[in-house]
Amino acid sequence: MKVQQYRLDELAHLVKGELIGEGSLQFSNLASLENAEVNHLTFVNGEKHLDQAKVSRAGAYIVTAALKEHLPEKDNFIIVDNPYLAFAILTHVFDKKISSTGIESTAQIHPSAVISETAYIGHYVVIGENCVVGDNTVIQSHTKLDDNVEVGKDCFIDSHVTITGGSKLRDRVRIHSSTVIGGEGFGFAPYQGKWHRIAQLGSVLIGNDVRIGSNCSIDRGALDNTILEDGVIIDNLVQIAHNVHIGSNTAIAAKCGIAGSTKIGKNCILAGACGVAGHLSIADNVTLTGMSMVTKNISEAGTYSSGTGLFENNHWKKTIVRLRQLADVPLTQITKRLDHIQAQIESLESTFNLRK
């Protein structure tokens, strides 16, 4: 199979960059600075990578004008303001796309479902009653769309995905393998020592340009819908409980868990393994560092942390012992000790004229 190649001047045009060098050069792929060969295009994202760039074998470099001045021994460049963004754009040029359309013979499609002629439905896909699949959408093998599910245009649904509960996906949504959208939320009413299941009557609404990784669970609402606004990106192994509302362009890293009826604002970042308790509200532009545990509302933008960073093991054990000892000391006693120490410091400053 012949590898598709692209001219350097064509690639520069796609990212609105300035071409310096030989525009007719052909490139078969993007590559890292370390592993690039002469038929590869690479990028330099900051001065810290200049040493690698100087010894790289790449045929051309995506750089800023300032970074180019540090690479006089190189000949071919695409000059842009943001090399990383240009790289992101060009990954889609070299990405291997699925060009098939139509419905595979092993797929099971309910007669009432509306499937675009430009969509692709893979082997052993099951699509239920009154479903809709939009133009240019790809649904890979063994995926199941239960009744009344709607998938918009230009979506990609990977294999072994389940979409249920009448979920609605807008355009350009990407969902990766083994994720469940619209599953039953964790709702139970306690009575007389038993848990009584609450039927989950809501759905899931997913906006444009949302990306959801593998092995995620996004539960449908109990009454109101679970909502992911436009541009939300979610890593693998994330749990989003019923009635959660996530604002546009929020990013959630792997192993995060968000309990029911919590609202997260726009442009937030949840780093890996964060936990968010239920029925809370988080403002726009909030960043939670890794393993943070949110137990109360966050009303102001900013960066928040909890938990303990890594210690050498013996140091960690000593710290835990001290924390336990501290917990046994009444707060009033600690306050008195601090007041006494402060008084001693002020007395010394006065005696030796150390006060500024």
UniProtKB/Swiss-Prot annotation:
Organism's domain of life? Bacteria
Enzyme class, broadest EC rank: transferase
Entry EC no(s): 2.3.1.191
What GO terms are given for molecular function?
N-acyltransferase activity
Question: What InterPro entries does this protein map onto?
Answer: Hexapep (IPR001451), LpxD (IPR007691), Trimer_LpxA-like_sf (IPR011004), UDP_GlcNAc_AcTrfase_non-rep (IPR020573)
Which BP terms in the Gene Ontology apply to this protein?
lipid A biosynthetic process
**Record pathway:** Bacterial outer membrane biogenesis; LPS lipid A biosynthesis
**Annotated Pfam families:** Hexapep (PF00132), LpxD (PF04613)
Q: Which UniProt keywords apply?
A: Acyltransferase, Lipid A biosynthesis, Lipid biosynthesis, Lipid metabolism, Repeat, Transferase
Tell whether Acyltransferase is among the UniProt keywords: yes
Record-annotated active site: 242 (proton acceptor)
Query: Which CDD domains does its entry note?
Result: LbH_LpxD
Gene3D superfamilies on file = 1.20.5.170, Hexapeptide repeat proteins (2.160.10.10), MurE/MurF, N-terminal domain (3.40.1390.10)
Any one Gene Ontology cellular component term annotated for this protein: membrane
Which residue ranges does UniProt annotate as crossing the membrane? none
Task: Give the catalytic activity.
Answer: a UDP-3-O-[(3R)-3-hydroxyacyl]-alpha-D-glucosamine + a (3R)-hydroxyacyl-[ACP] = a UDP-2-N,3-O-bis[(3R)-3-hydroxyacyl]-alpha-D-glucosamine + holo-[ACP] + H(+)
What is this protein for, i.e. what is its function? Catalyzes the N-acylation of UDP-3-O-acylglucosamine using 3-hydroxyacyl-ACP as the acyl donor. Is involved in the biosynthesis of lipid A, a phosphorylated glycolipid that anchors the lipopolysaccharide to the outer membrane of the cell.
Similarity comment: Belongs to the transferase hexapeptide repeat family. LpxD subfamily.
* Matches recorded under PANTHER family: UDP-3-O-ACYLGLUCOSAMINE N-ACYLTRANSFERASE, UDP-3-O-ACYLGLUCOSAMINE N-ACYLTRANSFERASE 1, MITOCHONDRIAL-RELATED
Which HAMAP family does its entry note? LpxD
Describe the protein's quaternary organization and the partners it interacts with: Homotrimer.
Tell me what this protein is called: UDP-3-O-acylglucosamine N-acyltransferase
* Record gene name: lpxD
